[in-house]
Amino acid sequence: MPLRLDNASPDFASKFKAFLAMKREVAADIEAATRAIVDDVAHRGDAALLEATEKFDRLTLDAAGMRVGEAEVEAAVKACDSETVDALKLARDRIEFFHRRQLPKDDRFTDPLGVELGWRWSAIEAVGLYVPGGTAAYPSSVLMNAIPAKVAGVERVVMVVPSPGGTLNPLVLAAAQLAGATEIYRIGGAQAVAALAYGTATIAPVAKIVGPGNAYVAAAKRLVFGRVGIDMIAGPSEVVVVADKTANPDWIAADLLAQAEHDANAQSILITDSAVLAADVERALAAQLTTLPRVKIARASWDEFGAIIKVAKLEDAVPLANAIAAEHLEIMTADPEAFADKIRNAGAIFLGGHTPEAIGDYVGGSNHVLPTARSARFSSGLGVLDFMKRTSILKCGPEQLAVLGPAAMALGKAEGLDAHARSVGLRLNQR
């Protein structure tokens, strides 16, 4: 059964603290096994990559067979249902429109001393996109990861996707084509992450790796971080719905289940000031649950990690929502904008009853790659800036150096870095 909390209870603070500390993933000790795979690919390249693909994906390939050719992509697109492809095109266009507004501007200015300062933005040259295969194939995630990279100006977007038994999801390939992926390889797991980071004879290395994956993929991303950049280590998905008596309980129940059906470790939370609404949502959820194809997954998620939190007044929900720092925050109240203005920590906010999270997942335009497990306290969802770098620019003339140089020399000497002081002093004809 889901957890029930009431902030009127004397032990609420301790129970809420325990709730925040709840672990939704039991991480197996896989680092050693993952490190062995990563090190093997780093040292033996294609040979290790092909061996791991045969072992884990039951797929025998040669080096040339790893890359998915244009003809195969075209055939996959033709095999897709036209209505779904049209939906992907709509999603692509809206995601691109949203992310183009995130493009930053260069700047160059002169300060009162006459020093020229500024910054310049440039795209990362090559990015690897990991896409899960098999039953967890989500073409929408291809769009969400690849399109911001292309908008940023990334030249090489390299997609890797496992094909257990040799089968690739046609919609994933269609999404890759629509999003502008430049290379696609039928490899997955920790070995694919290693290939992207270190490169092989077949796959040139990238500078950053993004995209979700299983525990081995997450462990591999941790191991290669530093050699390449990574987006984030994503945990199970989560939603918080804040609602008052004006909300529709059937809609809330559907949204809670939409999160629960993702994964048995997903989390769905309702915070409300209405005991009547809470009871109505529970009844609606129980009725809807039995009609879902993924009923076992959704039930496990709701029973194990679901929660209904009753608050005395709606304002009490603000600190709770900020503490949870949910990946998705839906606000179904009489004045959702007013509530949202008080929220500091959330991956994405969905305002009003007609904005279900599912719209943001697919066709809203905003990105659905969002921080989980309370990391919205310090991080943001994926965007254009994740695929760009800012370089500072500084220019002094003789006059400016004469003004700033003595202070730089003093600080260099104070820090025991005499060569620093000398590099300025020589230009000032000082020793």
Curated annotation (Swiss-Prot):
Where along the chain is Zn(2+) bound? 259, 262, 361, 420
Source organism's superkingdom?
Bacteria
* Residues bound to substrate: 237, 259, 262, 328, 361, 415, 420
Task: List the keywords (alphabetical).
Answer: Amino-acid biosynthesis, Histidine biosynthesis, Metal-binding, NAD, Oxidoreductase, Zinc
Please name the InterPro entries in this protein's record: Ald_DH/histidinol_DH, Histidinol_DH_CS, Histidinol_DH_monofunct, Hstdl_DH
Q: Is Secreted included in the keywords of this UniProt record?
A: no
Q: What does this protein do?
A: Catalyzes the sequential NAD-dependent oxidations of L-histidinol to L-histidinaldehyde and then to L-histidine.
Protein name, as recorded: Histidinol dehydrogenase
Q: Which organism is it from?
A: Rhodopseudomonas palustris (strain ATCC BAA-98 / CGA009)
Q: Give the taxonomic lineage as stored in the record.
A: Bacteria, Pseudomonadati, Pseudomonadota, Alphaproteobacteria, Hyphomicrobiales
Designated gene of the protein: hisD
